A protein has these predicted regions:
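Histidine/lysine/aspartate-rich catalytic loop segments that bind and position anionic ligands
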Residues: 80-106
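Short acidic alpha-helix initiation/capping motifs at coil-to-helix transition points
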Residues: 17, 34-41, 71-77, 111, ...
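Secretory/endomembrane lumenal or extracellular ectodomains immediately following the signal peptide
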Residues: 1-56, 175-176
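Structural motif
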Residues: 18, 51-58, 104-109, 136-141
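Acidic/histidine-rich alpha-helical segments that form the ligand environment
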Residues: 106-146
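Helix N-cap / loop-to-helix initiation motif
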Residues: 54-55, 87-91, 126, 138-139
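N-terminal hydrophobic signal/anchor transmembrane helix of membrane proteins
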Residues: 21, 37-42, 61-78, 143-160
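Acidic, carboxylate-rich catalytic segments that either coordinate divalent cations
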Residues: 132-134, 141, 150, 154-176
Length: 176
């Protein structure tokens, strides 16, 4: 069991000061003892510095795997060319797009894709998958990668709810 008794999550309870405005955002909404998303986000350094820490290629990978998990044509089509420009290889993009096995990918790519597939497909991340992603990215970067994926999942929900179409003349790039 990898759950800490004090926080009731995979990260131990932590007292402030926080790197982000966690208290202002989540202080009223947190359950007793400061549990909840703000407590977890406090382990990150913030999405504004994530790209500098992990590189554009991995940021694009996180965005694409999230777009694919939500079948978000808009997000996929807007980000897939940027992912290629950032150095994300076409064979890795194909693994995401066509839900192919992650065997043979480098460790960070495989860990991130496996993590996201469980998170968005099973609505849970199993202990072994979590440990693999933690080893690949470290605690701070993993928290911020999940925050990035969460932000893009929220975007996918908004785009789907309001049936956002691609810009005029832009061909869809996500096929199933």
């Amino acid at each position: 069991n990898d759950i800490y008794p004090d926080s009731r999550s995979r990260l131990p309870l932590r007292s402030g000061p926080y790197q982000t405005s966690v208290t202002a955002l989540y202080g009223r909404m947190a359950s007793p003892g400061g549990l909840g998303p703000g407590q977890i986000r406090a382990y990150g350094d913030g999405m504004q510095t994530l790209e500098a820490r992990v590189g554009t290629r991995l940021v694009m990978l996180a965005i694409l795997v999230t777009a694919r998990a939500h079948d978000s044509q808009y997000e996929w089509t807007m980000y897939q060319p940027r992912a290629l420009e950032s150095g994300l290889e076409l064979h890795v993009i194909d693994v995401i797009q066509y839900d192919r096995p992650i065997d043979g990918l480098n460790e960070k790519d495989a860990a991130l894709i496996g993590f996201a597939r469980e998170l968005f497909g099973d609505y849970n991340v199993f202990s072994g998958t979590y440990v693999r992603a933690l080893a690949a990215f470290g605690q701070t970067d993993l928290v911020d990668i999940v925050a990035l994926m969460g932000a893009h999942a929220a975007d996918a929900a908004v785009l789907a709810a309001f049936d956002q179409r691609l810009p005029e003349g832009v061909e869809p790039l996500l096929s199933f």
